[in-house]
Structures are given as structure tokens and as C-alpha cells.
């Protein structure tokens, strides 16, 4: 995996074994695991700091994983099975424990004992610094091309364009859920095909419950299409002016989006 791009680029350009685009939970965890194995790794993050969404997950409690993770719960079990067999719930818990974050289980969900996302973000940042990972924030990747057996990535950083050279690139830039940016365009520019994307793990839009906006309740939700039951879940729901939110809505939202 070691890069041989020593002659690439001009002075000031940076060369790595792996460049990760995106410093969310997945990108940062990937960087830490690679660096622990001695890989020279860098991360380019568009936002002003890493792990922005991680800080908000689980209503600030930081839901790290689920004890019921199984290939059978995915639309394509055969595709995801090798990944989950190699790195499942036990491995996830062990990884966080190695960073000083013991976990506990509640209602099938894994949370840090501190019950606060801040301790997870701080542990990630501390690991990045300890392992010497090159983290560049406010750095938006704008182009990628194959170059001398690896890749050349252009990024707008601090008002200037910088080039990164890496033998391997990991795309961990997420979807277009809130950014308004086409984060998949870099991959398609390399010739990869994309499938149609729909919202998942998202509120379900509706204006039927304005009178009870802000109310939380434990409820059962059944999603139907004609006489067919598409999903049947029970959990907490949060009524909003313009949507149903909460864990119940999130668990129904994927089937809802596909049914539209």
C-alpha cells in the first residue's frame, strides 16, 4: 500500500499512502485504523471541524452501533455479509474501547458510558493527533484523476487550491442529505456508476399533526401500500409541524421513500 509517488507534483503538494475525503465518523475511524497499522494517511474535510454529524447523533448521546446488526436486515444481505462478518458489533465496541470509550447497551443500541457525543468526538480528535494523521479542514475536494499509479486530488483550502497525491483514495463524504452538494460527482468522474438515491433514516413529511407539535409518544407505525404492509415498527415518535420524527419515523422512512 505504500505510495511510490515521490516525484509527483510540485513543492508544497502532499503525498500519502491513503487520502480520505470526508472526516465524519466513518472517515475519521478509517483514518485511525489505517494509521494504527503504520499507513501514512491524510483526511480532507469540507467543514470547519471533523465529526460534525457525530456530535449530534442519538440526540447528543452518540448511538455508536446496534446489537442486532445482521445481514438479514439489509436489502442485499449477500453484499453486506462479508463486511459485517469482518467487523461487527463486537469489533465496533472493541475499537471504541481501544480509544478509551467503553460502551453500554440500552434497548439494543450501543452508547458510550459517558452518554455524551462530546467524549467520542474528543477521543477521535485525540487519536488523530496522537497518530500523526494529517487532518485538513475547510478543504473541499473539487477534482480527482488517476495519476502515476495512484490519484491526484484537487481541493480548495483556505482560498487556495491544493493538490494531494495518494496511492489510494477512500470516499467517506456521505450523501447529499443536507449539503446541497453533489458529493458523489468525484466518484462518477472516475467512471463509477451510481444508483438512484432516496432519503433514509429521515423524518417523514406531513402536516397532519401541527396541533401536537413537540409531543413525544411511544407508538406503533404501520406503512401500507394498498393492502400490502411495507413496514411495521414500534418506538418513540416525535410530532413536528411538518413531519413525524423520532426513532419510529426513522425506521419507517426507508420503506416510505422507496414506496413513493
Feature locations, PLM:
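Extreme N-terminal leader/targeting segments of oxidoreductases
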Residues: 1-18, 36-37
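N-terminal Rossmann-like FAD-binding beta1-loop-alpha1 element of flavoenzymes
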Residues: 16-43
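Hydrophobic anchor at the start of a short beta-strand
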Residues: 18, 39-41, 103, 169, ...
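Redox-cofactor binding/interface segments in oxidoreductases and associated redox assembly factors
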Residues: 21, 56, 171-175
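Glycine-rich FAD pyrophosphate-binding loop
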Residues: 35-59
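Glycine-rich active-site loop/strand segments that organize a redox cofactor
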Residues: 58-107
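A cross-family phosphate/adenosyl-ligand binding-site feature
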Residues: 113-115
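Predominantly flavin-linked oxidoreductase catalytic cores and closely associated redox partners
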Residues: 118-119, 126-260
Amino acid at each position: 500500500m505504500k505510495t511510490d509517488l515521490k516525484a509527483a507534483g510540485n513543492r508544497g503538494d502532499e503525498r500519502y499512502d491513503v487520502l480520505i475525503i470526508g472526516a465524519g465518523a466513518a472517515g475519521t475511524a478509517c483514518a485511525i485504523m489505517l494509521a494504527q497499522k503504520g499507513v501514512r494517511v491524510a483526511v480532507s474535510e469540507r467543514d470547519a471541524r471533523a465529526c460534525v454529524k457525530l456530535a449530534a447523533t442519538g440526540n447528543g448521546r452518540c448511538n455508536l452501533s446496534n446489537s442486532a446488526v445482521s445481514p438479514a436486515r439489509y436489502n442485499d444481505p449477500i453484499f453486506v455479509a462479508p463486511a459485517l462478518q469482518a467487523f461487527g458489533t463486537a469489533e465496533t465496541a472493541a475499537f471504541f474501547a481501544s480509544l478509551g470509550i467503553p460502551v453500554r447497551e440500552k434497548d439494543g443500541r450501543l452508547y458510550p458510558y459517558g452518554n455524551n457525543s462530546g467524549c467520542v468526538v474528543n477521543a477521535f480528535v485525540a487519536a488523530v493527533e496522537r497518530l500523526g494523521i494529517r487532518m485538513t479542514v475547510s478543504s473541499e475536494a473539487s477534482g480527482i484523476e488517476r495519476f502515476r499509479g495512484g490519484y491526484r486530488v484537487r481541493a480548495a483550502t483556505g482560498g487556495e487550491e491544493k493538490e494531494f497525491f495518494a496511492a489510494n483514495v477512500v470516499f467517506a463524504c456521505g450523501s447529499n442529505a443536507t449539503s446541497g452538494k453533489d458529493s458523489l460527482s468525484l466518484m462518477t468522474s472516475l467512471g463509477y456508476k451510481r444508483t438512484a438515491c432516496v432519503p433514509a433514516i429521515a423524518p417523514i413529511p406531513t402536516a397532519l399533526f401541527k396541533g401536537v407539535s413537540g409531543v413525544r409518544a411511544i407508538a406503533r407505525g404501520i406503512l401500507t401500500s394498498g393492502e400490502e404492509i411495507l413496514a411495521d415498527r414500534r418506538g418513540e415518535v416525535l410530532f413536528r409541524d411538518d413531519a413525524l420524527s423520532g426513532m419510529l419515523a426513522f425506521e419507517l422512512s426507508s420503506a416510505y421513500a422507496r414506496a413513493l
